[in-house]
């Protein structure tokens, strides 16, 4: 499916970026193929009017622990002991995986489309990656 995003405020992510208007973002099969003037003929594209909303590339988070929500801990805890306790039972593993999936969704809803995990529970991060890719 081809989409044309119109009437948006574009932030392109460059160092000295300025809001750009009067442009249209063309997407073919999930890939941005061009950014053209909004006067361009959009035949063959499903038009999505952004109604003046902002649009920008996905953010990248290069240091993620999906087993945590990113909030500061109120008290010190023994993470190694906690991980062993969580991984011991299929029920607690299932609960932990659901939490990890939720934290990944929080990243996505915050505009982060790419993450690099640097430690987590078992193989939860690769399992989640594979489920998303399927």
Regions found by a protein language model. Name each.
Residues 12, 47, 101-103:
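A generic local structural motif
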Residues 54-131:
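Metal-associated gating/positioning segment near the N- to mid-region
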Residues 13, 35, 50, 62-64:
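Generic detector of well-ordered alpha-helical packing
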Residues 43-49:
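Short, well-ordered secondary-structure micro-motifs within conserved domains or adaptor modules
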Residues 1-42, 55:
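N-terminal metal-binding scaffold of metallo-dependent hydrolase/deaminase domains
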Residues 134:
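A metal-dependent hydrolase metal-coordination microenvironment
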Residues 2, 45, 113:
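Conserved acidic residues
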Residues 5, 27, 49-50, 61:
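Short, acidic, Ser/Thr-enriched surface-loop or helix-capping motifs
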